[in-house]
Amino acid sequence: MLGLFRKLLPREDRFFDLFADHSRTVMGAAEALNALLAGGPDIESHCDRIVALENEADEITREVLLAVRRSFITPFDRGDIKDLIQSMDDAIDMMHKTVKTIRLYEQKSFDPGMQAMGAAVVEAAHLVAEAIPLLSRIGANAHRLSAIAEEVTHVEDRSDQLHEQGLKDLFQRHGASNPMAYIIGSEIYGELEKVVDRFEDVANEISGIVIENV
């Protein structure tokens, strides 16, 4: 009877399938955000894609949290699973918030610094996408997982510099002559910086999981 009951519950490896699915939505949204920041006629389609992927990511997050409650066995601590998936979801939520700002102010072109930050978002998303499947064998992959977390931190450091330089450039161009352009630009820069910050949060969660399980 117990064996039959266990078969009805989520498998341990189901968590890694869900993590991978969520990571793919985050990666897709990062690539769409980067393409959006290039400007051009397809801005709205890129915005729509990010919104759709964010909705998909929310559904996956709910599946993970439900599986945590229903499972006898989890691959690592339940709290760590919850914190990991929610940190990943926060990253795509922040991309969605950036889209809302871009649509609100009807922005059609973006500064080179914003485009560079879009590339940083893609780089961070790629690193997280590499890390997620490695969590299925933490001991064997501990060194690479730690290295990935460090690489994400470096990406975030570069993003900080791009953010600061972007605000400076905006002020020099618009600070006195067009305050509204400065306000809008600084808001977009700030939200892009927060996207990269959320990826650093994911990296920190991964580092914590490695420390607790090796």
Curated annotation (Swiss-Prot):
Described by its record, this protein's role is as follows: Could be involved in orthophosphate transport.
Regarding protein family, the annotation reads:
Belongs to the UPF0111 family.
Pfam families attached to this UniProt entry: PhoU_div (PF01865)
| UniProt xrefs under SUPFAM superfamilies | PhoU-like
Segments spanning the bilayer are none
Q: Which domain of life is it from?
A: Bacteria
**What species is this protein from?**
Rhizobium meliloti (strain 1021) (Ensifer meliloti)
Annotated protein name in UniProt:
Putative pit accessory protein
